[in-house]
Structures are given as C-alpha cells and as structure tokens.
Amino acid sequence: MGDILAYEADLLGLVKEFLNFGEFQETLECFSKECKIKGKLLPRTSGSSLRESKTLLIQKDLITAFEDGDIKEFFALWQEHIPVETQNTNPVAQKLEFYLQIHFAIFPLKQSQGRIDRVDCEERISHFKTYLETSGAALSQTTEFLPFYALPFVPNPAAHPSFKEIFQESWEAELKMRLEKFLSVILKAASTPKLITLYKESLHNNQEQLQQLQQQLMETEHKARTYKKCFNKMQSDYHNLIGVTADLVDSLEATINGKLITPEYLQSVCTRLFSAQMKQSSAQSIDFTRPGTASSMLRASIAPLKQQEVPLFPSLDYEKLKKDLVFGNDRLKAFILQALRWRLTRSQPGEQRNTVLQAYISNDLLDCQHNEQKNVLILLRSPSEVVRQYTALLIDVCASLGYGRVYLSQNPRLLHSLVEAWKAEEKESIARETVLGILQKLSLRRSMQSAMIKDDLIFWLVRELEDPDHLSDYALQYTIALFMNLCLRTAGRKLCSRDADHVLKVLSDLLGHENHEIRSYVNGALYSILAVPSIREEARSMGMEEILRWYIREGNPDMNCHIEFIIRQLNSEDKFDESVESDDEEEEKDDEEDEDALEADLDKDEIIHAQSGELSGEKLLTTDYLGIMTNSFKVKKRMFAGILQSADEPLQRPVTPSSHRAMNTVRKNSNSPSPLTNTFKSSQANKMSLSSSRPPTRSGSRASSSDSIDSEASRLFSPNSLTDHRGAMSPTSPRILDLGMEKNIVQNSSKAWLPRSPEVQNATSRKTRTPTIAPQFSQSGPQQTSYSSSAGSSTRSRQSTQSYRK
C-alpha cells in the first residue's frame, strides 16, 4: 500500500493525460471531480500540458517559416519533427511535401515587388531539381504532379499558363490550411501519452522475453532428451556390469570349491560384456579360450585414440592469386578470399593448419613484408561490402593464430589501414566488428600496442564505450578488452590521465552494464589506470570508492574480490614514475608458443554462394591456382606457458575475450582444492594482505617508489620459465598472475590446468586407426585429450542486436 501512495499522484496524472489525449472530456470531468471528493490531488502541470505547449510551439515555427519563405528553417524543422516513416510511406505527407517544395521554389517570384534576387531564385530552383531527382521521383508517374517536373526548366514560370494556378493567393492559402491540419494531426500523434508508451514498451519486452524463454525451452528439452538417452545407456551398462560381476564372483567361488570354468561360460560372459559394442555374431566368433584375449579386448576398448596422418593441402600459385585479388572482379575476389579463409578454418589443427599458415606467410599473401601501393590490403577500402567483409575475415583468421600475429605486425601500414577501415564502416556492419576483433587480437603484440597508443586509439575506444547500448555484445566485449590491453601499458595509462574524469565515468557506468562478461575487462582497466596518482585523485574526488562498494553488494564473489583489489589500489599512496618505461622498452619475444584460437562462427552466414558452373572453396584454388612447392612448414613448439590467474584478482595481462572464456572454463571444470589447500591459500593471502596494501605479486609486496604495475605484470612466470617477460598472451593461453600460491604449487597446478575449448575438441576430432587386437569398443572410457585446439565460441552477439546476424 505504501508503494501505491508514493506513486499515486503520478499514476493519476497518467490517467488524466490519457483521457485528455483521447478527448474524453466528460469522463475527465467526472474523474477530476471524484479525485477532488476523495482528496486525491491531481498534478497541476501534467506531461500532457507540456507536450501540448511544445507541439503548438513547433507548429507555430513551421507556419512562420512557411509564410516567410524560409526554406532552410522549414525543412530543418520538418525533418526533425515529422517521423521518417511518415515522410516515406504516408501518401498525404508525400503529396503535401511536393506542394511545399513548389511553394518555396517560386516564393521569390511571388513576393518580388520589383527586382528579383536571381541568386536566391537559382538556389531554390536547384534545390527543387534535387528534390525531384531524389525524394520526389516516387511521384513522377502521378498525373497530378507530372507537369511540375518541367517547372525548373521554364524560364518564366509566372507567365506560363500551365503554372498559373500556383501563383494565385488562394492556392497558397489553401496550402497553408492543409499544412496546419496535417501538423495538428501528425504532431499530436507524435506526442503519445506516457501510458501508451509504457504499454507498448511492456508489450515489446514481454514478446522478447517470451521468444527467449521459448528458445531456452527448446534447447533445454533437447538437452534433456540427450541426457536421458545417455542416462538410460549408462544405467543399462551399469546393470549389465553388475550382473556380469555377480556371475564372475560365483565363478570364483566355484573355482575355490574345485569346479572348473568351461570355455562356453567364458564365451557367454564376454559376449555380454561386448554386446553393446559388437554384433552378437562377431563377439561369438572370437576365441576367448585363448589366454589374454578377453583382457586384451577390454584394455583395447579404452585405449587412447591414435591419430592418423592428415594429408597436406596442394601448393598454390600465390603470385596469380594476389594479382587476381587486386585486379579481378569483385565476385572473383570474394570467392578467392573465402577459399583462402576456408583453408585455415577447415584444416586440422597441427601440421596441416600450420603448413597452410606458413605458406601464406612465406609467400606474403597479404603483402605485409612489402609496401607496394597496389597490394591486397587495399581490399579493405573496396567499394564492395562483401569484399571488405571477406578481406577482414581472412585477416581475422590470421590474427587468431600466433604466427599470423607476428606476420601481420611486420607491416607498419596495416594498423593504419585497419583503424581507417574501422572508422569508415557503418556501426552495424560485419566488417566493422571483424576489424575490431583484429585490432583486439593484434593488441597482444607489444609493438602493435605501442602503435595503437601513439595513434590515440584509446580515446576512440572511450567514445565508443560512452553508449554501450548501441553496440552488439561482441563489439562491446572486444572494445573494452582492447581498451584494457592498452591501459596495461605505462604509455596507455599516461594517455588516460589526460582525460581522467571522462575515462573514469565511462568505466564506472560499464560496471553496472547488463552484460556481465565485460566486468573482468572493466575491472582490469580500472585497476591498471588507478596506478597513476592523478587518476587516483580524480577517482577519489568523484566518490569512486562508494560506487565500487555499492557493486560489491550486487556482484558475485569473484567480482567482489576484484573490486576489493581495485579499492586497495584506489587508496594506495604508491608513486608512479613516469620516466620509467622498463616494461615498455624490453625486447618483445615472438609469441610462437601461444596457443592458436579460431573462433567458432568465422564461417557462419556466408554471403556469397557458388552458382551453377562457378567454382568455390578448395575446388577453385586447386583448379585455377595450383602451384609448385609453395608450401613451407615450420615446426611449431607448443609450450603451454599460460597459468591460471586467481579468480580473485583483476586482469593484469593482455587477453582476448575467447582466451578469458577458456580460462574460466578450465577453472570451472577443474577439481575443487582440498580443505588443506584452501587453508594454505587463505593463510598466504592473509600474510600478504598484512604486508602490503597493494595486490601481492609472486615476489611479495613491491617497493612503492619505483615499481609500476607494468613491472609487476612483466615478472609473471610460466611452467617453463620463471623469467618470461613476454608482453602478450595467446588467446587460449591466459598467463596472468596467480595470487597467494607458492611457486612450486603454481607450477604444478598450471601443468594440470591447461586452457582448452570443449566445443573445439569435439570439432577437431580425428579419424582413428583400429587396434591390431580388436576394434575400439568403449565410447565412454578414458580418452587422451588433444591440446591442439582453438578457442571456444566467441558468442558473437552481433546476431542478437544486429540485422545481419539477427
């Protein structure tokens, strides 16, 4: 009841506004009278009155501009206040606009008292011609308007008999009356009462929620059916094993009592054991009386799967390919780009994919090792949207692979081309989001980070993040992840300090965004930039600690720990030596040991498809572009340098969203630590928190006067080397600080917890060779997992917010 009383006046005002809008005057009088009797106060100045006054003001301005012949003012107001849908689809609005264009075109001829302003007259006629060629072209087939298409070409329209009517005062007066009537109806419809707006929004939201729930229901039912089948299978196998076990126990007891086990009995037991994997006749044909046969078959059924040799793709004529990519027609370019991308995305991880990538690099497919004006990178500026998109997708695949990032970093003009393409593309285009993904992956390379910071890309990203609701989930995640990677550098933090107030406001707003997957990147960026004293002071002055503590109440335990670290950073007094660039100056190592990460939906929703007689994919490459000995293969060392960062701590190393998801997946799938380990970690964390107000590093609390967070991040260690100073992290090898653990524990745990994607493991399974003893039987036994996998799905919610993926 208290809630109703609190909002009662507003609710009564909404009802009053709606009744007034619908012209229910008698009902409104009765309603007002009854409210007065019951002591209910109606708002004196309702939203309706304000809207009505605003509508009248707009209408007055339009009529004034009409009478004065002010064409610019009139059509500026017209475009602003008349809905676009009404302008494009309403026949009354289209006809009225046509006559209004005529009115303004001949206005100087009607109002001139003597000398005519020829310049003004020519400008108006030119404007009218432009209208006839664009918006007015739709009415060119209408008999009523057909004569007026000759108006701009008549030297003296006032003297022409065909246009005599429009120069009469009655015509202008009638047009003004039609305009007033139209504006009163349209502007009133535009000022919809709040009650109707609330109803429409609620209805729209309910429909969206219903669709989401229906989709979730279908997925859940499908999973339930799958799980039920698995359960029934497991239950059947379990009962079968219990029965076989009971029979074997009876046999052992009989053996103790001196009874012999017959071959027929052993045959029946083995047949029951293998009945699920083998046909009955096949199982009965095997000689189980031979010693070791049954046990060998059992062991073989759970033996690790052996991988077959994967054939390499044929060599290509890359010179001809690059020539056709530059000078061919747009459709051919698109098919070539698609086929080259498919070679990478549809190849088997390992030798086959590495050979394809090395062939692209050694033959300089993207012209990253040369700086000719006419190279493949000009396709990013192609007038064809399909070519631009497919070019970006091919570069994105290369940027998803460790060697590919090294190769792309060799061209200093590539970054400039990518940034220009990103800025030039429309906000909801696939090409724009793909280019954003490329920039984010390239930000794993220290040289590319430096170039991006130098080009002030940080401020572009901040402007993008000002309005996150207009970004798809994919664009939002990759934008904030790129921003965080750049903020981890000393130069990036310095740049943020120039506009600290703006940056902090944008990040604090993102803390409350409904997409919780971005919280880790927001936390990492905040923690990093708060190392700068000037930014800390700005954050304190705007009450950042109160904002953060409010989110602690709302967040999950992991995020709460992140925020606690950020608050410690905010309240610290550590100095930030701007002259020290130790981590920025250190030599960058190639990230060849990084795990490669190909996103799952790179080949979804292909725009072009081969028609009858056209070649595409591998068939196109091997038919028209077959080469000789252009493949080169470099053995790629797999060094799982990544360690799992503590879930308590904000990100402090460059990551991609796919790598972060992989890290979280591994953390969730890993076994829970024992109580003893938990106690040990808790005690270590307590000791560290007592010794320093800053988040601890593996070397303890740092000196507050000289070390920066950059140097803290650069001292991270891997299972293979405790002095690894690489500045970039592979998309599937997150190598971030582990909090509160001894070195040997971190090393051991990191070897066991290797980030990988369950989806990709299924997608990249190889054909298996049949063991020499017997076929593989068990499909549920222990399997040897292959670690050469790509990252998990990028969850490109482009599809959730954009028409092309929606």
UniProtKB/Swiss-Prot annotation:
UniProt keyword annotations, A-Z: Cell projection, Cilium biogenesis/degradation, Coiled coil, Cytoplasm, Cytoskeleton
Pfam families, A to Z: ARMC9_ARM (PF21050), ARMC9_LisH (PF21051), CTLH_Armc9 (PF23138)
Region (Disordered): 576-604, 650-736, 748-806
Coiled-coil portions: 194-230
The keyword Secreted belongs to this UniProt entry's keyword annotation: no
GO cellular component: centriole; ciliary basal body; ciliary tip; cilium; cytoplasm
Ranges for domain LisH: 7-39
Domain of life: Eukaryota
Keyword Coiled coil: yes
GO biological process terms on file: cilium assembly; positive regulation of smoothened signaling pathway
Biased composition (Polar residues): 655-688, 759-782
Biased composition (Acidic residues): 579-604
Subcellular compartments: Cytoplasm, Cytoskeleton, Cilium basal body; Cell projection, Cilium; Cytoplasm, Cytoskeleton, Microtubule organizing center, Centrosome, Centriole
Classification via InterPro entries: ARM-like, ARM-type_fold, ARMC9, ARMC9_ARM_dom, ARMC9_CTLH-like_dom, ARMC9_LisH, LisH
Biased composition (Low complexity): 689-708, 783-806
Known function: Involved in ciliogenesis. It is required for appropriate acetylation and polyglutamylation of ciliary microtubules, and regulation of cilium length. Acts as a positive regulator of hedgehog (Hh)signaling.
Full protein name: LisH domain-containing protein ARMC9
Organism: Xenopus laevis
Name of the gene this protein is made from: armc9
